[in-house]
């Protein structure tokens, strides 16, 4: 008997991806706050958990739904960047995110794509230098009038009237299993995706749909919003439909009505500003504008209740007192409970344990979690970046604008927003206890920028791994920056000017003249309004500081093992010197975030300093496109009885001079779509060198890979994909159909060269089978007849007859359990004698009947099938293989424990030939 002992280990990774085409870093951050749930899901895309941002990946796997290559992982992910004032515990607890599905969140810029009122005009996007000033004379074609229309488009659907125009691309953040990025849309339906990829988002209105590179469809049919549904909303994944249309995974939610205020999600927001108003007489007035303290913005976020597929389902059960606090996950297969996960929490806010139970309701294993106390609640005191910096604000009506001291002895009576390391770490995860009862502890420290200045947010400092007896097994500690200086690149230093928006108030009044009343310019007031948070983005990839160099040390104090040095690509954003009026811009001219955080190099040395492994990557930009935007800001406000002069202010010298030719301030910026990919990779491992060079197509797929070994010999692999054939394909051809169904991932042609000599070639031919497109033939060099031929499929897209070159027999299959499992295989014969009625009945049934299986078994003695070999498969209610019957009638049985794990394998006499034990501690 063979015994196997298996141990489950929690994945804690220091991730450092190599290929640029998998990047999901956004080109530009969102300006509008999405719902808390969307923020929690999206941040694992825009704030990647790698050492470039000082983070490690902490994931608790719960369950994975797998259907025809589609994987829906259900997991708890922890983001160890620190807790902000507007973070919410949501389903799992502070810092944790339930990942089970996906979201598409929309934020309007300038005019929304979903305005139902007003009169839409063509987009107005010009270079600032080309916008004509002082042409507001009543002409319908003046540039300054077009800016009026742009500002009008930025209103909500409830207040907009008259003509409007767009000037910026709206943004959709999308995140679903194995895919994330941004999709941009302009009012004229011009669109693009960041990064350029084979994933396509379309129908991006009130029911967005995405297709992945295999042609699988993801539908997002349930929505939440903050009430202004035309400018800010999130859609949630409701269906995944396989490319062959044979399988659908359903996501069910409890939708929340706006009247159910106790069920809404209330996100903390800070709105109040502090203004200085300087008039012509040299008098300065100051005022607080807006509601002080921390207020709330409400979202009607739906609650995930169930994920189901063909009799299998995952149920999510919540607290009866806290509707969004997840208490239990129950996993069923074919109606049978196979396992459950129960959560223990403190105050519904901190996850203390995740306990896994089998079908017999007995605990199998668990994870435990400990934290650095609790973060302050309510009217908390915060630093410049939104992290906690003290026990509480001095008053529930405190002014959260920083207490800056400004030129001319001006002061703002706001809060002290400086960083406090101790309070920033409150509520952070510090320990995970594994099912083995071993555990890992985590130590964090604040980010450090140039010159050692501390910045908001946390980075990993140290991880210690202990066994169940509390003995240290391994230690990892991290040194950041060039030469381990501890310093990275701060995105922006704190500057009061970044918090300030400026405007100009102009009084217009009537005065008697020789020919009647005339319009005169009266009082002029300059306004500086200071906000609680900077208008310019202080984050890149979600972090206040990024690190181009990080060194990881490993070992124990008694036995150091060496170190690993990581080097990442790092580019600063490119900023304008100012707006049209010379003020600070909110958005950089070009954001280079999409090129940052790529693994440039990795060097591993042992404890003697000897290099045992090294990797060096060279990158290049591909498929780059820059899209111009025009951001327009209100600046001059003409008020008073003669305010109508603003419609023709250019005809009045005083007003045209005072406004400097425009009522607005504006600037350009670009959104970049492209990819930053590995061009060449050099690797040294165990004394062996190799170099790999890559070339890509317009969708970022590798079309050529050249491997050069230590001796200088080259092997070249060239691939062609759907888009490479589609360019020259006729309309209606298989390549045309695959292209428009977004089936891009299959390599249709693979050629292998040794030097210049072709040594191997494989061609994969696809066919439109009516309801779906699937593989028909596999051909190889010198065999222009098919080497593998797929002759037929069932209605679920499963192959039913396959033949291979060199084998003088076909292999036929019957699928059961609604196309989820093979129940019979025949070699050298066919199942035609069963007839289509029985075959279809068996395939469609939730479980084949005993009578139908007996008919299939009887084929073993059918004289017409003499010489053929039949194998049958039997499954339990959870679709685990229960019995295998070989062509000679030999039976092998499989038994499982209450958690659905394989426990033992028995021969036909009941003798155990293999057993499995799982290394958990109770």
What residue spans do the PLM features occupy?
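Beta-strand elements of repeat-based all-beta scaffolds
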Residues: 207-211, 238-241, 304-308, 327-330, ...
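Low-complexity, serine/threonine/proline-enriched polar segments
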Residues: 277, 381-405, 488-522, 610-612, ...
């Amino acid at each position: 008997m063979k015994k196997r002992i298996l141990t489950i280990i929690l994945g804690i990774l220091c991730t450092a991806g190599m290929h640029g085409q998998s990047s999901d870093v956004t080109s530009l951050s969102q300006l509008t706050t999405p719902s808390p749930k969307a923020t929690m899901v999206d941040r694992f895309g825009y704030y990647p958990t790698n050492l470039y941002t000082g983070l490690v990946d902490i994931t608790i796997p719960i369950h994975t739904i797998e259907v025809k290559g589609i994987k829906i992982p259900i997991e708890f992910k922890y983001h160890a960047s620190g807790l902000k004032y507007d973070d919410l515990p949501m389903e799992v607890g502070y810092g944790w995110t339930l990942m089970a599905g996906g979201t598409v969140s929309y934020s309007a810029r300038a005019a929304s794509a979903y305005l139902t009122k007003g009169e839409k005009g063509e987009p107005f996007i010009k270079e600032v230098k080309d916008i004509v000033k002082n042409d507001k004379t009543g002409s319908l074609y003046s540039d300054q009038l077009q800016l009026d229309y742009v500002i009008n488009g930025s209103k909500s659907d409830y207040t907009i009237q008259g003509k409007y125009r767009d000037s910026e691309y709206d943004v959709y953040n999308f995140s679903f299993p194995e895919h994330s990025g941004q999709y941009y849309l302009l009012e004229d339906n011009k669109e693009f995706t960041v990064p350029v990829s084979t994933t396509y988002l379309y129908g991006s209105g009130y029911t967005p749909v995405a297709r992945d590179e295999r042609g699988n469809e993801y539908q997002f049919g349930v929505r939440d919003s903050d009430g202004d549904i035309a400018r800010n909303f999130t859609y949630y994944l409701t269906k995944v439909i396989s490319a062959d249309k044979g399988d659908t995974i359903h996501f069910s939610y409890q939708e929340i009505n706006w009247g159910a205020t106790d069920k809404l999600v209330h996100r903390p927001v800070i709105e109040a500003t502090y203004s200085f108003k300087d008039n012509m007489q040299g008098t300065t007035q100051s005022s607080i504008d807006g509601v002080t303290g921390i207020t709330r913005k409400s979202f009607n976020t739906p609650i995930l209740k169930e994920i189901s597929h063909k009799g299998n389902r995952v149920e999510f059960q919540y607290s009866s007192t806290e509707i969004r606090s997840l208490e239990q996950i129950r996993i069923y297969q074919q109606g049978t409970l196979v396992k459950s996960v129960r959560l223990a929490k403190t105050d519904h806010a901190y996850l203390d344990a995740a306990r896994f139970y089998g079908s017999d309701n007995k605990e199998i294993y668990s994870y435990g979690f400990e934290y650095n106390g609790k973060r302050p609640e309510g009217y908390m005191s915060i630093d410049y970046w939104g992290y906690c910096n003290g026990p509480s604000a001095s008053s529930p009506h405190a002014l959260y604008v920083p207490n800056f001291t400004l030129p001319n002895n001006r002061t703002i009576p706001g809060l002290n927003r400086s960083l406090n390391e101790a309070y920033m770490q409150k509520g952070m995860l510090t320990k995970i206890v594994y099912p083995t009862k071993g555990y890992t502890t985590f130590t964090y420290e604040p980010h450090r920028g140039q010159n050692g200045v501390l910045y908001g947010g946390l980075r990993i400092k140290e991880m210690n791994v202990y066994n169940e007896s509390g003995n240290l097994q391994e230690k990892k500690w991290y040194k950041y920056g060039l030469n381990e200086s501890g310093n990275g690149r701060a995105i922006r230093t704190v500057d009061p000017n970044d918090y300030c928006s400026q405007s100009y108030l102009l009084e217009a009044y009537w005065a008697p003249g020789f020919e009647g009343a005339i319009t005169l310019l009266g009082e002029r007031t300059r306004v500086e309004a200071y906000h609680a948070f900077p208008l310019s983005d202080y984050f890149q990839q979600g972090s206040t500081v990024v690190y181009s160099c990080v060194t990881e040390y490993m070992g124990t104090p008694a036995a150091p093992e060496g170190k690993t040095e990581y080097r990442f690509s790092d580019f600063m954003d490119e900023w304008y010197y100012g707006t049209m009026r010379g003020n600070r811009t909110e958005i950089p001219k070009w954001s280079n975030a999409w090129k940052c955080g790529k693994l440039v190099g990795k060097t591993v040395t042992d404890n003697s300093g000897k290099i045992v492994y090294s990797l060096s990557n060279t990158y290049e930009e591909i498929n780059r496109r820059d899209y111009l935007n025009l951001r327009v800001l209100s600046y001059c406000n003409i008020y008073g009885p003669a305010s109508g002069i603003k419609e023709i202010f250019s005809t009045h010298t005083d007003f045209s001079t005072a406004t400097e030719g425009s009522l607005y301030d504006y600037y350009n910026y670009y959104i970049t779509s492209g990819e930053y990919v590995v061009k060449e990779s050099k690797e040294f491992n165990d004394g062996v060198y190799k170099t790999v060079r890559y070339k890509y197509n317009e969708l970022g797929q590798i079309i050529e890979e050249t491997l050069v070994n230590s001796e200088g010999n080259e092997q070249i692999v060239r691939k062609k994909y759907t888009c490479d054939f589609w360019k020259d394909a006729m309309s209606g051809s298989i390549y045309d159909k695959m292209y428009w169904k977004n089936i891009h991932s299959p390599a249709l042609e693979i050629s292998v060269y040794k030097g210049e000599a072709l040594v191997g070639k494989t061609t994969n031919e696809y066919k439109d089978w009516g309801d779906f497109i699937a593989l028909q033939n596999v051909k190889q060099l010198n065999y222009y007849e098919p080497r593998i031929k797929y002759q037929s499929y069932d209605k679920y897209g499963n192959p039913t007859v396959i033949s291979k070159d060199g084998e003088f027999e076909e292999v036929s299959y019957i699928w059961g359990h609604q196309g989820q499992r093979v129940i019979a295989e025949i070699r050298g014969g066919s199942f035609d004698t069963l007839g289509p009625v029985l075959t279809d009945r068996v395939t469609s049934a939730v479980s084949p009947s005993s009578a139908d299986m007996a008919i299939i078994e009887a084929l073993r003695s059918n004289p017409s099938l003499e010489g053929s070999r039949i194998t049958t498969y039997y499954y339990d209610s959870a679709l685990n293989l229960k019995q295998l019957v070989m062509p000679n009638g030999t039976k092998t049985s499989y038994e499982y424990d209450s958690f659905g794990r394989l426990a033992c394998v028995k021969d036909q006499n009941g003798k155990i030939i293999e057993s499995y034990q799982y290394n958990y501690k109770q």
